[in-house]
Amino acid sequence: TVVPLGDFIINLKESSTLRILQMSISVECETSVESKVVDKTAEIRNAILMFTSEYTVESLTGLEGKMDLRDEIQLRINAIIKPHRVERVYFTKFIIGK
């Protein structure tokens, strides 16, 4: 089952200019885990917003940066819904802008 977590607009950590990340995230999980993800959506969204604001444009540029963020999101979600887990995290939108 794929569960959308919605749109995110996050101020990135930049010293000189305001930069934002606009992204949409969905997660894939077993059908039996879907209700746990939905029940914890506010906590999951808060965690994603808080730790992603520490990223810089440079750290998110390129495939490796996006994969690192995706892996970190999956780890954080799985910590929140433990002992359940999500199998995959999908970016359905990923835009860095001013």
Give the residues covered by each predicted segment.
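Flexible, low-complexity charged segments
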Residues: 1-98
